[in-house]
Amino acid sequence: MTMAVPSRARVYADVNSQRPREYWDYESYVVDWGNQEDYQLVRKLGRGKYSEVFEAINITNNEKCVVKILKPVKKKKIKREIKILENLRGGTNIITLQAVVKDPVSRTPALIFEHVNNTDFKQLYQTLSDYDIRYYLYELLKALDYCHSMGIMHRDVKPHNVMIDHDHRKLRLIDWGLAEFYHPGQDYNVRVASRYFKGPELLVDYQMYDYSLDMWSLGCMLASMIFRKEPFFHGHDNYDQLVRIAKVLGTEELFEYLDKYHIELDPRFNDILGRHSRKRWERFVHSENQHLVSPEALDFLDRLLRYDHYERYTAREAMDHPYFYPIVKEQGRMVSSNSPTPNALQGPISTTE
């Protein structure tokens, strides 16, 4: 077993080391429990592997909220999720944690969140226009750049964890249960993210990954949306998942990545990987999706779906890509139309112009 070559995030690598220990040391965190009686469950919204989610009413102010009742899981994991949510509170497009209480019956913790109209992206995102795809991905990138700048990787970016209130064009990144603090040189568990959104680093068991994992997942969402193919990489298990990726990005390119980081491939891949050439993105375009595809969309996609995590666009770089020019232009226009004009600040307009 050779040692894999270490890797370090291209951005925000040292943010946690520049903060006091309390910021990232979630195991020492002491939870401030709120009052459970303040919340009344209204209806069940869904259930996940680790929790059940309800719509509720905060009876102190009559406002709707969302209650996530956690299933029995290690205290450490619960503390991690709470600490991360506390650290990110108020961040752009990050779901707001309002309180943490104990369920009186089960004694399990329940997280109280702001209420978001419960359409997850999954139901919506195969029906969006070209402009809407750009708009919502830009909003999602704001959330990712924010959490990365705060030293946190989400590690479960997928449509199901992106809540959209389409009427108000509001987006929230939810479910921080797999999120983790980034410390350069640390080895992380590769059993994170959902199969179709797992980066190659997870599938080849490379543990020294970073924020760039989230950018692969975002790339999978983009591909799925512009090509109207859900999911884009449809593996039947984690091994097949890498094969599906290799059929698009190429096997030669995969081996270059493995060589660069001295990664040894699980022998189980020997019989299933085969040899595949890299495919051009254009080959996924057809009459049903061509209205969503543009040269800049394909260029942007190509900068996200890279084997080498170090080469992938960061969230900030992604936001500066020409794909988002129409959005940036529109958001700039809205900002300037809401602020006083320079003339209004300068008194009478001179007539010499």
UniProtKB/Swiss-Prot annotation:
Pfam families registered for this protein in UniProt: Pkinase
Q: Which domain of life is it from?
A: Eukaryota
Q: List the disulfide bonds.
A: none
The EC designation for this entry is 2.7.11.1
Where along this sequence does the record place binding of ATP?
Answer: 45-53, 68
Q: Which reaction does it catalyse?
A: L-seryl-[protein] + ATP = O-phospho-L-seryl-[protein] + ADP + H(+); L-threonyl-[protein] + ATP = O-phospho-L-threonyl-[protein] + ADP + H(+)
Q: Which residues form the active site?
A: 156
Q: Which GO terms describe its molecular function?
A: ATP binding; protein serine kinase activity; protein serine/threonine kinase activity
Q: What processes does the entry annotate via GO biological process terms? A: regulation of cell cycle; Wnt signaling pathway
* Residue stretches making up the Protein kinase domain: 39-324
From the UniProt entry, list the residue stretches annotated as the region Disordered.
334-353
Which SMART domains is this protein grouped with?
Answer: S_TKc
Q: Which UniProt keywords apply?
A: ATP-binding, Kinase, Nucleotide-binding, Serine/threonine-protein kinase, Transferase, Wnt signaling pathway
State the InterPro entries in the record.
CK2_alpha (IPR045216), Kinase-like_dom_sf (IPR011009), Prot_kinase_dom (IPR000719), Protein_kinase_ATP_BS (IPR017441), Ser/Thr_kinase_AS (IPR008271)
Alphabetical GO CC annotations of the entry are: cytosol; nucleus; protein kinase CK2 complex
SUPFAM superfamilies per the UniProt record, alphabetical: Protein kinase-like (PK-like) (SSF56112)
Record note on quaternary structure: Tetramer of two alpha and two beta chains.
* Similarity comment text for this entry: Belongs to the protein kinase superfamily. Ser/Thr protein kinase family. CK2 subfamily.
> What function is annotated for this protein?
Casein kinases are operationally defined by their preferential utilization of acidic proteins such as caseins as substrates. The alpha chain contains the catalytic site. May participate in Wnt signaling.
Protein name as it appears in the record? Casein kinase II subunit alpha
